[in-house]
Amino acid sequence: MTQPIARSIPLQVVSGDTAAPAPLQTGVKQIGGDKINRSPVQFVDAPVLRKPSWIRVRIPSGNAVQNLKAKLRENRLVTVCEEASCPNIHECFSHGTATFMILGEVCTRRCSFCDVAHGRPKPPDASEPASLAATVADMGLKYVVVTSVDRDDLRDGGAQHFVDCISAIRASSPNTRIEILTPDFRGKGRMDRALEILALSPPDVFNHNIETVPDLYPNVRPGADYQWSLTLLQRFKAQHPSIATKSGIMLGLGETMEQVQATLRDLRAHDVDMITIGQYLQPTPHHHPVMRYWTPEEYKALEDYGNALGFSHVASGPMVRSSYHADRQAAGAGVAA
């Protein structure tokens, strides 16, 4: 029997601590409360909602997960699966798939939903593209997703490093399809530089997540801009009409059905081909609280709505994540593996 939907809960948002935080040390991770305490917003007195029956993750048995983790550590590589505490990590790792996170483990942003560490990043590792390409070849991957932390400290936002990774993978694994999940390249001239650089070696799928509806950006994505993200997606598509574009949105942060539908319309109006829709899960008690658990029936309704808008592929469900079954999503959108 389907459980009734949890009611929306009130959210009290207060300004962050006005006292000057301690200076960031290069390469030192600020996680959990240390990270969120640096955010311009804090969340207080939010009741904890019990997870419904459809929010469950099966933990596979066997050594595949540990073997893949060992391979990643051996090559000094990082996955967003681990750094962002993705609930699907065991399923993906047990099938030998992973979403690689380049440009370090420290992000310059402080998004309230994200479990990736904040701080002052180290310079990019020049050996990372070769290590990544060797690992992809060793694993025999036919489809790989490469993402990164935000690098507001770099003039190109890390675009050249993305291109170096794409080129290295293609040199050693020419039949592997590559999806990149990029930051927003926000900043004066940064989007222009990033798009110019990415044109040198574009991916097979370009993914940038819108994350949430525009009204929630101040609380969820401080430092980001809704229209900027839409423009990035549209400009890439205009430059590369034959390359699939993709975005993702989380539910459960306080949005309404009407707001989600409006965001889907905005994405299609900006020439986005593929969309993922999934339930937000709070990574620690310090992060943005879960305001509501959307039901499987609502996810199905959004899938139908997205298909009617003309997306080439809609992945909508409680446990859907941007990179979850990315190869199947791409195949569904006509990207050959």
Swiss-Prot record:
Binding positions for [4Fe-4S] cluster 2 per the UniProt entry: 107, 111, 114
Catalysed conversion reaction: [[Fe-S] cluster scaffold protein carrying a second [4Fe-4S](2+) cluster] + N(6)-octanoyl-L-lysyl-[protein] + 2 oxidized [2Fe-2S]-[ferredoxin] + 2 S-adenosyl-L-methionine + 4 H(+) = [[Fe-S] cluster scaffold protein] + N(6)-[(R)-dihydrolipoyl]-L-lysyl-[protein] + 4 Fe(3+) + 2 hydrogen sulfide + 2 5'-deoxyadenosine + 2 L-methionine + 2 reduced [2Fe-2S]-[ferredoxin]
UniProt subcellular location: Cytoplasm
SMART domains assigned: Elp3
PROSITE patterns per UniProt: RADICAL_SAM
Membrane-spanning intervals of the chain: none
GO molecular function: 4 iron, 4 sulfur cluster binding; lipoate synthase activity; metal ion binding
Cofactors that this protein relies on: [4Fe-4S] cluster
InterPro entries: Aldolase_TIM (IPR013785), Elp3/MiaA/NifB-like_rSAM (IPR006638), LIAS_N (IPR031691), Lipoyl_synth (IPR003698), rSAM (IPR007197)
Protein name (database record): Lipoyl synthase
Gene name of this polypeptide: lipA
